[in-house]
Amino acid sequence: MIRYIKNIVIAIIISVIGINCTAICINAEAEERRIVYLTFDDGPSFSNTDSILDILCKNDVKATFCIVGSNAASNKGTMRRINNSGMGILPHCNNHDYKKIYNSTESYANDLDECMKTINGIIDEERTYTMVRMPGGSTNTVCSRDVLRNIKAYLKSRDVNYIDWTIDCGDTKKTVVERSVIKENIEEVCGKSVVEVVLMHDLENKKTTTEALQDIINDYKNLGYEFKTIEAMEPWEFDYLISRKIINRE
C-alpha cells in the first residue's frame, strides 16, 4: 500500500514537472522569436498603396493597412487588392477630420461604424473587427481627455482593442520627408523590442515612405524578424504589447 501511494506521488510529480517544462519550452520559443508589424495609415490612395503592395508581395511580406473609409470608397480596386493579397485590415476612421471625429464619443462611434461598414461593403465580407487604430493614436492631444477616456471605455465595452506603435517612421513631420531620413528614423531604433509595430503612411504624397520600404524590410529581415498581419497576432504577442502600453493604453 505504501509503495502504491509512493508510486502515485512520483507519477504526479513527474506529470507536474512535465507540464511546467512544456510551458517553459513554449515561453522560450516565444522569446526566441522576433515579430514586426508594418502598418500603413490613412489609405488606400490612388497609386501609392499599390506601389507598397507591389513591394510587399515581391518580398513575400505581410503588413496591415489602417483604413480611412472615404479613401477606400474612392479607391475600391486597391481596397480589394489589399484584402486579396492577404494583408491585414484595421478600421482607422471614415473621414479623417479630427475635430469632427473627436467632438464626442458618439461622433467617434458613428464614424468608426461607418468606416467598418464601408470596408465590409467593398470587400464583400461581414467582418467583425476586434482591433482598431485611433486617428492620431490613443494619446492624441486633439481630443479632450474626458472624451478620449470615454471613447476607450466605449471600445472596451464592444470588446474592441486599439493599437498604437513602437516606432514612428516620421513621415508626417512635414509634407515630404526625405527617404534617407525615414530610413534613418527606423534604423536608429529597430530591433530593440521582441515585438515591434512600425507606423507609416500610404497617402499619395508619402512616396518617399514607399521608396524607403525595401530598406526597412531588408533591415528587419537581417535582424531575423517575422512579418505578420495584426489579425494573426498570437496571445503572447498581445500580452507583450499590452505590457508595453502599445495596445489599450489608458
PLM region spans:
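N-terminal pre-catalytic segment of deacetylase/amide-hydrolase enzymes
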Residues: 1-39, 44-60, 74-80, 179-184, ...
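Active-site beta->alpha N-cap acidic-glycine motif
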Residues: 26-134, 219
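Catalytic domains of cell-wall/extracellular-matrix polysaccharide-remodeling enzymes
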Residues: 96-199, 203-221, 225-226, 232-233, ...
